[in-house]
């Protein structure tokens, strides 16, 4: 119980691996790993790459992206 309280007090932010999304729930389409890595790391992720032929086509996938950054969720992209 004490360790849980300490964890909450330290303000540790959780992370996840996911497609980074624009505010309208659209992915960032890509052609190179370099562009995605920059986008992901600029948003606090450990790294990123261009996922070729994935669920949303060629889109940026981020590794250890902070929870505060929007990710692609089920549903439509609202452009």
Curated annotation (Swiss-Prot):
<feature type="disulfide bond">
    <location>
        <begin position="36"/>
        <end position="60"/>
    </location>
</feature>
<feature type="disulfide bond">
    <location>
        <begin position="40"/>
        <end position="62"/>
    </location>
</feature>
<dbReference type="InterPro" id="IPR003614">
    <property type="entry name" value="Scorpion_toxin-like"/>
</dbReference>
<dbReference type="InterPro" id="IPR044062">
    <property type="entry name" value="LCN-type_CS_alpha_beta_dom"/>
</dbReference>
<comment type="similarity">
    <text>Belongs to the long (4 C-C) scorpion toxin superfamily. Sodium channel inhibitor family. Alpha subfamily.</text>
</comment>
<feature type="disulfide bond">
    <location>
        <begin position="30"/>
        <end position="50"/>
    </location>
</feature>
<keyword id="KW-0800">Toxin</keyword>
<dbReference type="GO" id="GO:0090729">
    <property type="term" value="F:toxin activity"/>
</dbReference>
<feature type="propeptide" description="Removed by a carboxypeptidase">
    <location>
        <position position="79"/>
    </location>
</feature>
<keyword id="KW-0528">Neurotoxin</keyword>
<keyword id="KW-0732">Signal</keyword>
<dbReference type="InterPro" id="IPR036574">
    <property type="entry name" value="Scorpion_toxin-like_sf"/>
</dbReference>
<keyword id="KW-0738">Voltage-gated sodium channel impairing toxin</keyword>
<feature type="disulfide bond">
    <location>
        <begin position="26"/>
        <end position="77"/>
    </location>
</feature>
<feature type="domain" description="LCN-type CS-alpha/beta">
    <location>
        <begin position="16"/>
        <end position="78"/>
    </location>
</feature>
<dbReference type="GO" id="GO:0005576">
    <property type="term" value="C:extracellular region"/>
</dbReference>
<dbReference type="GO" id="GO:0019871">
    <property type="term" value="F:sodium channel inhibitor activity"/>
</dbReference>
<keyword id="KW-0872">Ion channel impairing toxin</keyword>
<dbReference type="InterPro" id="IPR018218">
    <property type="entry name" value="Scorpion_toxinL"/>
</dbReference>
<keyword id="KW-0964">Secreted</keyword>
<dbReference type="InterPro" id="IPR002061">
    <property type="entry name" value="Scorpion_toxinL/defensin"/>
</dbReference>
<dbReference type="GO" id="GO:0006952">
    <property type="term" value="P:defense response"/>
</dbReference>
<dbReference type="Pfam" id="PF00537">
    <property type="entry name" value="Toxin_3"/>
</dbReference>
<keyword id="KW-1015">Disulfide bond</keyword>
<comment type="function">
    <text>Binds to sodium channels (Nav) and inhibits the inactivation of the activated channels, thereby blocking neuronal transmission. This toxin is active against mammals.</text>
</comment>
<protein>
    <recommendedName>
        <fullName>Neurotoxin BmK-M9</fullName>
    </recommendedName>
</protein>
<feature type="signal peptide">
    <location>
        <begin position="1"/>
        <end position="14"/>
    </location>
</feature>
């Amino acid at each position: 119980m004490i360790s849980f309280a300490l964890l909450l007090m330290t303000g540790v932010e959780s992370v996840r691996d996911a497609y980074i999304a624009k505010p309208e729930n659209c992915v960032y389409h890509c052609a190179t790993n370099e562009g995605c890595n920059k986008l992901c790391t600029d948003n606090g992720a450990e790294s990123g790459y261009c996922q070729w032929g994935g669920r949303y086509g060629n889109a940026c996938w981020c590794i250890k992206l902070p929870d505060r950054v929007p990710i692609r969720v089920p549903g439509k992209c609202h452009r």
